[in-house]
Amino acid sequence: MLFVPRYMPLLLGFSMAIAACGPAAAAVIATRSYSYFTIKGKTADQLDQQLSSNGPTASGSSARHPGATKIRFGGDATYVQAGGRCRVSSAKVTVHTQIILPRWSNRKGASKQLSMIWDALSSDIKRHEERHAEIARNQARIMERQILALPPQSTCERMQELVTDVSTRGIDEHDRLQARFDRIEAVNFQNRMIRLLNNRMKTSGGER
């Protein structure tokens, strides 16, 4: 079974600035990029070996994987102090995801069966990693809403502490959601691949 874990260096730092009075504003900034690593092979075993030797590593492990998603959080918040109280004026959470996928360089001349298996596997790897990126974006939006909903505090220093606490708890929840997704995906991998292959066989006329 192939596992497709994500690699996630997480960094979230909020800067503090005192702003003029105005309505609270939010702006999640999400960017996504793709990069590829090359594999070669004419058999399923060769491709599997190439994925194991050329794939990206996960954080804290030397093991290589068929795909990965690097995720980096960041952000800042500004505050308004008026009437002896400090509130959040604006918050911006940023999340950058880099999806790393395999690219089969010498596919030409490979058997139709191997090509079909690879198409099913590579599409599943891509879907899996893009879902990791989606989870990160969704969590960034949740964190932003939670920061903007914080009640006014007596000082902006205290408000900064609350913002930091929200961001820390948000990152922890993000990690739990990502780990849960990986566990579910691993359990369902075999059935998912069988379904993908059957669908591709039907599409290509493999069933009579």
Q: Which residues does each predicted region cover?
A:
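Bacterial N-terminal signal peptides
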Residues: 9-19
